[in-house]
UniProtKB/Swiss-Prot annotation:
Chief place of localization: cytoplasm
GO biological process per UniProt: cell division; cell wall organization; peptidoglycan biosynthetic process; regulation of cell shape
HAMAP family: MurD (MF_00639)
Domain of life of the source: Bacteria
Name of protein: UDP-N-acetylmuramoylalanine--D-glutamate ligase
Reaction(s) this enzyme catalyzes, per UniProt: UDP-N-acetyl-alpha-D-muramoyl-L-alanine + D-glutamate + ATP = UDP-N-acetyl-alpha-D-muramoyl-L-alanyl-D-glutamate + ADP + phosphate + H(+)
Length: 454
């Protein structure tokens, strides 16, 4: 798509929107930055835009006159596609694309795209580390924090772009075709945005829609949703499993990660060599290895990278030990499945800090996963009473409601015994109390480090 001289409305004044404006301005488009939130500070937005930006910034409503003049609309990932004004733009037959589709117009080299309800950031980061051991030009972008549009003009024909893709980003792709895609797992999440599980699954599977048999899709064999949809995925599928041996793919045998194809079988590594804990992390490693194999990285390079990988911040991140109590930060555990994995990874009695913004999740499976491991459930945020009621119904005894994260940390520090663990794994989004899960995790670590050692 040629944007020279085109009038383009970029919707969303966040990081993705600003980055899209920069790229489109470089391509000679007439850009307009729009956000429905009238309370945003225009001056603050202006500071983030290119110095030579000459386009308008519009907040609140869109005039009919402007709508009639638009050639293209670029939606930021955080903007739901079912908003009234977005529907009006669609009905006017104005082409609407997302930030990923915009970036893809300019992307060179190979692309590995990773999605899934949980494990995206860890897997994307690990794939990036593996690629950097073998390829000279590697870019790690997407939902991981760096907009695809920000880096895409730096890509060359010999580059590898590793992109973390959320369901929000995948809703608006049209021609995006990764050489390798991966869907790590699908469990209920973001139903406040997608409304139905079927719509959420479709958004995830969208990552494969333009692939062909020449491309590869990495899938988790133990995910029933993925087994169900696999028949209509056009790419060549490479499965992984943490439960059973596969005729072809990646799997666990005792403590070893094994790769088997039509010709041979080889040991990738012993899981005891890994610096990350939990079965879910072994699955992330298998997915990353599958992507690397599909992109022709030699096994020696893969093995070196996976055994050095220390994980990502805010995902079952060891913080410190205070007075014989270990503290773990799993602020990225924003849904039941992610938080279940965090609890399973704990080796001792655990004081669990949970609660936050309500994404219409059901918490029963999360609570049932406590078994006898969770000694105190400390709850905060919008969902604290909803979770507390579910926990009481399921027989959880020690439930404590607090008003702040600092209060939660202080309570746990006072009640945790030597050899026990304090885990922040909220099972909820951070919105309302914190800017994002990163701020929540950073504050948790700050409060923990401020605790007295004696």
């Amino acid at each position: 798509m040629n944007f020279l001289g085109k009038k383009v409305l970029v919707v969303g004044a966040g990081k993705s929107g600003i980055s899209a404006i920069e790229l489109l301005s470089q391509e000679g488009a007439q850009t307009i930055l729009y956000d429905a939130n009238e309370e945003i500070n225009k001056e603050e937005i202006s500071k983030k835009l290119p110095i030579d930006y000459k386009g308008d910034i519009i907040l609140g409503g869109l005039s009919s006159e402007l709508k009639s003049e638009l050639d293209v609309v670029v939606l930021s990932p955080g903007v739901p596609t079912d908003l009234d004004y977005v529907k009006e733009l669609k009905s006017a037959e104005i082409p609407i694309i997302g930030e990923v589709e915009l970036a893809y117009n300019f992307s060179k080299g190979k692309i590995a795209a990773i999605t899934g309800t949980n494990g995206k950031t860890s897997t994307t980061t690990l794939v990036g580390e593996i690629m950097k051991t073998y390829y000279k030009s590697v870019f790690v972008v997407g939902n991981i924090g760096v907009p695809y549009t920000q880096m895409v003009k730096n890509t060359e024909n010999d580059s590898v772009t590793v992109a973390e893709m959320s369901s929000f980003q995948l809703e608006t792709i049209e021609t995006f075709r990764p050489d390798v895609s991966a869907i790590l797992n699908i469990t209920p999440d973001h139903l406040n945005r997608h409304h139905t599980m079927e719509a959420y699954i479709e958004a995830k599977v969208n990552i494969t829609k333009n692939q062909t048999k020449e491309d590869t899709c990495i899938l988790n064999y133990e995910d029933s949703y993925l087994r169900t949809v696999s028949g209509r995925i056009p790419a060549t599928i490479l499965w992984f499993s943490s439960v059973r041996e596969l005729e072809r793919g990646l799997f666990l045998r005792e403590n070893h990660i094994i790769y088997r194809d039509d010709e041979k079988e080889c040991v990738v590594c012993d899981v005891n060599e890994l610096q990350i804990i939990g079965k879910h992390n072994y699955e992330n490693v298998m997915a990353a290895v599958g992507i690397a194999i599909a992109l022709k990285v030699p096994m020696d390079f893969i093995r070196e990278a996976v055994t050095k990988f220390r994980g990502v911040e805010h995902r079952i991140e060891y913080v410190t030990t205070k007075r014989g109590v270990k503290y773990y930060n799993d602020s990225k555990g924003t849904n039941p499945d992610a938080s279940i994995q965090a609890i399973k990874a704990m080796q001792t009695k655990t004081l669990l800090i949970g609660g936050g913004y309500d994404k219409d999740s059901d918490y029963d499976d999360w609570i049932k996963a406590f078994d006898d491991k969770v000694t105190y459930l400390v709850l905060l945020g919008q969902t604290r009473e909803k979770i507390a009621n579910a926990a009481k119904r399921l027989g959880v005894k020690n439930i404590v409601l607090v008003d702040s994260l600092s209060e939660a940390v202080d309570f746990c520090a006072e009640h945790a015994g030597v050899g026990e663990t304090v885990l922040l794994s909220p099972c909820c989004a951070s919105w309302g109390m914190f800017k994002d899960y990163e701020e929540r995790g950073m504050l948790f670590k700050e409060y923990v480090h401020a605790l007295k050692d004696e």
